[in-house]
């Protein structure tokens, strides 16, 4: 019932929803992986939800695609594609993740996990660890290096965190205290088909977060860090305290 182009109408819909419903959390879903291609509005939807959540001072949760649906033209995402959905959501400031399936879930019972159960378990653990580190911080920007998708923003020239290597398909999610400069960045490999190595530089000594153990370590290059990222994977770095 809202008017305007797709973006304006959806922004107004979100504004009205928040005003009328007064939710404690914004939860939405967007299914990106089609049978033979990918959608073209995933980052647009993610950016608009992020914008609405920030304006309202609310956390948001992304319910991500975790199954196929032949009748609707969806393919079932593999491990790398689910990792891509998880880390792109995290870089845009999501506070939570849900996995949408039509059937019984990722396991029928404790003795019958499907092929995605253990990889997703590890990814959820890493999401929780990184999201916990970012809980007291604000999402200050989500920037695309290389090709900028519909709804995305290019990395500003004056960004505190930059890529040292030639342009790669990398997403930088910047976090810090509200109205301050970024101190943390989530670095995501946007290629879910192949691993990559990228070097990120910052304005001072950097530290890298090891999500499985929830520990920080000094970057060997002080104000630069080389990251080996799996397909669709990401890492959290910060300025040394």
Regions found by a protein language model. Give the residues of each.
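Glycan-processing catalytic domains of CAZymes
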Residues: 1-205, 210-241
């Amino acid at each position: 019932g809202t008017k305007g182009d797709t973006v304006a109408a959806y922004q107004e819909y979100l504004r009205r929803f928040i005003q009328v419903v007064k939710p404690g959390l914004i939860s939405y879903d967007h299914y990106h992986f089609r049978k033979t291609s990918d959608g073209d509005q995933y980052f647009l939807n993610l950016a608009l939800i992020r914008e609405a959540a920030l304006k309202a001072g609310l956390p948001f949760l992304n319910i991500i695609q975790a199954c196929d649906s032949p009748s609707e033209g969806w393919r079932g995402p593999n491990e790398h594609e689910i990792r891509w959905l998880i880390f792109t959501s995290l870089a845009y400031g999501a506070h939570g993740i849900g996995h949408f399936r039509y059937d019984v879930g990722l396991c029928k019972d404790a003795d019958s996990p499907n092929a995605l159960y253990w990889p997703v378990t590890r990814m959820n653990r890493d999401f929780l660890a990184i999201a916990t580190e970012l809980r007291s911080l604000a999402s200050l920007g989500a920037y695309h290096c290389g090709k900028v998708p519909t709804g995305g923003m290019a990395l500003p020239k004056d960004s505190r965190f930059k890529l040292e290597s030639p342009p790669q398909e990398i997403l930088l999610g910047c976090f810090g205290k509200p109205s301050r400069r970024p101190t943390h960045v989530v670095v995501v490999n946007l290629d879910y088909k192949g691993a990559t190595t990228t070097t990120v530089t910052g304005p001072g000594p950097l530290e890298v977060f090891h999500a499985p153990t929830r520990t920080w370590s000094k970057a060997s290059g002080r104000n630069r860090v080389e990251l080996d990222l799996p397909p669709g994977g990401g890492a959290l770095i910060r300025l040394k305290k």
